[in-house]
């Protein structure tokens, strides 16, 4: 059937067709090679925006540092980072005046969090810069390595298990004259293979102790590792993102906790809420501006874009904000919160892997590590790279670049939102003291500004004043990329507003289709995505029905499980046909076993096993869901599982789907070609953690697991839990006296061993 595409849009307002312009179909672009060039761009740009600031030298590390705070006010529209301290403090004071008690209350909430947070909070998150190995690691491993090194250097406050105590160790570690670390390394030997008589390379993994003096340790503690941001759609150029080490993470977490608590109380903040809640918040602000501008005023909205938000923010400004927001709080609390911005003012950016060179004529490839960029002859590089290296050289120390100004992506989203909202707050008539006034929305670097005034001149004046106010706080509204419209049509964080929010369906496209976890999860996720889009994204019944049929088709193709009565030949069709013929009630077979699809848009909320349970043959039920069947027993049965969805914007989100453990919920094994590399020692550590955590979960199944209050180690918790459970089981007659005594004996032995340790 041929469709003339223009017919699709005849009755659709232009805004509703916005979906079709988004770059969300197909694979997103990934980066290859090193991020060194992108990182140098970031460092150079950041310094350029602050170039008229004051240069100083860090006394501990010798790093040159540029401080643009209270620098000269810009005379043109170029982006700049010269925030004025007194202006920022005044904006904070006005924010507090409009929201009495906001800082005080948020501080009280945060103090409670600080005292209760366990150090395992830092195991969340994926890649983390591991300063002990000088490269990226999974967060849990990086934390473990840090704690291990701390303990071997006599720093033991962290043993309490509280995050605040771990941070005490971090502070102490910075005063130490030297730190001893264990590094993994790899030895290669050429040996003759006894069987084949060929020479082979044998690799052995070793650990060796290394001492870092105070300067080297501080550089590592203040380092942010950089990588290229992958899978960014709609951009030609890649860009660098940073991942901080464990010394910085805990402090950042507490600052962001305070800022999050403040954002929750600000009606103009687009964080930390999301989805429908965010849309409701937005709609409220728009409604407020529309109702107040009925007869005498006109109202315009700017869909705003800021130039290089992160690179013009400054940690010193954040320090001023924190100092103000916590001014009546206990000294210890103010100190804890001020450390993150201080560390960021002294941060170092690791330049990544370096450059790859290849000589076509000599068939040679070689890598120039970042450490060599400081003194390598520049004749090997092309012009643009040469300029980059020349500009960055004065800032280099041991392969890292001193980067005092700027914030790096994604570190202080909440706190920078507070800064943005403080300007929106100044738009009230009692502050503008004139006929125009403004309000708006801020979510990290994205904003929408609504200006009301009696006439166009007033609107222009209001926008100009907003623009200049932003400059005073180191925020640069881009005149090229922002556009203004009559209120009622604007875009904010990829939500399109036209007298109400228009569904931007293309955002959801990447999550349709078969996820590739396993047959059971994929079926469940597939129908859940369709259900969610019917609820949230204007996916109509006819389209949903079509999406469902396409999904089933895709699913059958992926898992080669076409219906038992089909003519299609696949690797599985022989087995599936056999099962089809043996089955009395064919409707009871799961789609993944060659059964028919019983889903329609009315029953998407029911897991397939439940939908078909009554229709199944008894022996099929017995095979499918029998815990004694070795293909089922590995799965703990939980009612809800989480899948990680990659939405179009924002971080990966967790999507819940109903999970019924069956023979189809298998877990694939990971490829372990890692075993003969220097990662192997790390892997063994990781497996040890995995085992400990699995054991712990056996004692505390998720349903009964409450965060341990008070300070007890994992072992103590498990022993006391074992004793309680054993007593209950013994008293209710589930276990015999001998078993009970044996359990008690084992518990005592474990405690004895701990005492001896």
From Swiss-Prot:
<dbReference type="GO" id="GO:0039657">
    <property type="term" value="P:symbiont-mediated suppression of host gene expression"/>
</dbReference>
<keyword id="KW-0693">Viral RNA replication</keyword>
<dbReference type="GO" id="GO:0039694">
    <property type="term" value="P:viral RNA genome replication"/>
</dbReference>
<keyword id="KW-0548">Nucleotidyltransferase</keyword>
<keyword id="KW-1104">Inhibition of host RNA polymerase II by virus</keyword>
<dbReference type="GO" id="GO:0030430">
    <property type="term" value="C:host cell cytoplasm"/>
</dbReference>
<dbReference type="GO" id="GO:0039523">
    <property type="term" value="P:symbiont-mediated suppression of host mRNA transcription via inhibition of RNA polymerase II activity"/>
</dbReference>
<dbReference type="InterPro" id="IPR001407">
    <property type="entry name" value="RNA_pol_PB1_influenza"/>
</dbReference>
<feature type="short sequence motif" description="Nuclear localization signal">
    <location>
        <begin position="203"/>
        <end position="216"/>
    </location>
</feature>
<feature type="region of interest" description="Promoter-binding site">
    <location>
        <begin position="249"/>
        <end position="256"/>
    </location>
</feature>
<dbReference type="GO" id="GO:0019083">
    <property type="term" value="P:viral transcription"/>
</dbReference>
<keyword id="KW-1190">Host gene expression shutoff by virus</keyword>
<keyword id="KW-1191">Eukaryotic host transcription shutoff by virus</keyword>
<feature type="region of interest" description="Disordered">
    <location>
        <begin position="53"/>
        <end position="82"/>
    </location>
</feature>
<feature type="compositionally biased region" description="Polar residues">
    <location>
        <begin position="55"/>
        <end position="64"/>
    </location>
</feature>
<keyword id="KW-0945">Host-virus interaction</keyword>
<dbReference type="GO" id="GO:0003968">
    <property type="term" value="F:RNA-directed RNA polymerase activity"/>
</dbReference>
<dbReference type="GO" id="GO:0042025">
    <property type="term" value="C:host cell nucleus"/>
</dbReference>
<keyword id="KW-0696">RNA-directed RNA polymerase</keyword>
<keyword id="KW-1195">Viral transcription</keyword>
<comment type="similarity">
    <text>Belongs to the influenza viruses polymerase PB1 family.</text>
</comment>
<keyword id="KW-0808">Transferase</keyword>
<comment type="function">
    <text>RNA-dependent RNA polymerase which is responsible for replication and transcription of virus RNA segments. The transcription of viral mRNAs occurs by a unique mechanism called cap-snatching. 5' methylated caps of cellular mRNAs are cleaved after 10-13 nucleotides by PA. In turn, these short capped RNAs are used as primers by PB1 for transcription of viral mRNAs. During virus replication, PB1 initiates RNA synthesis and copy vRNA into complementary RNA (cRNA) which in turn serves as a template for the production of more vRNAs.</text>
</comment>
<dbReference type="GO" id="GO:0003723">
    <property type="term" value="F:RNA binding"/>
</dbReference>
<protein>
    <recommendedName>
        <fullName>RNA-directed RNA polymerase catalytic subunit</fullName>
        <ecNumber>2.7.7.48</ecNumber>
    </recommendedName>
</protein>
<dbReference type="InterPro" id="IPR007099">
    <property type="entry name" value="RNA-dir_pol_NSvirus"/>
</dbReference>
<dbReference type="GO" id="GO:0000166">
    <property type="term" value="F:nucleotide binding"/>
</dbReference>
<keyword id="KW-1035">Host cytoplasm</keyword>
<feature type="short sequence motif" description="Nuclear localization signal">
    <location>
        <begin position="187"/>
        <end position="195"/>
    </location>
</feature>
<feature type="domain" description="RdRp catalytic">
    <location>
        <begin position="286"/>
        <end position="483"/>
    </location>
</feature>
<keyword id="KW-1262">Eukaryotic host gene expression shutoff by virus</keyword>
<keyword id="KW-0597">Phosphoprotein</keyword>
<keyword id="KW-1048">Host nucleus</keyword>
<dbReference type="Pfam" id="PF00602">
    <property type="entry name" value="Flu_PB1"/>
</dbReference>
<dbReference type="GO" id="GO:0006351">
    <property type="term" value="P:DNA-templated transcription"/>
</dbReference>
<keyword id="KW-0547">Nucleotide-binding</keyword>
<comment type="subunit">
    <text>Influenza RNA polymerase is composed of three subunits: PB1, PB2 and PA. Interacts (via N-terminus) with PA (via C-terminus). Interacts (via C-terminus) with PB2 (via N-terminus); this interaction is essential for transcription initiation. Interacts (via C-terminus) with human PKP2 (via N-terminus); the interaction competitively inhibits the interaction between the RNA polymerase subunits PB1 and PB2.</text>
</comment>
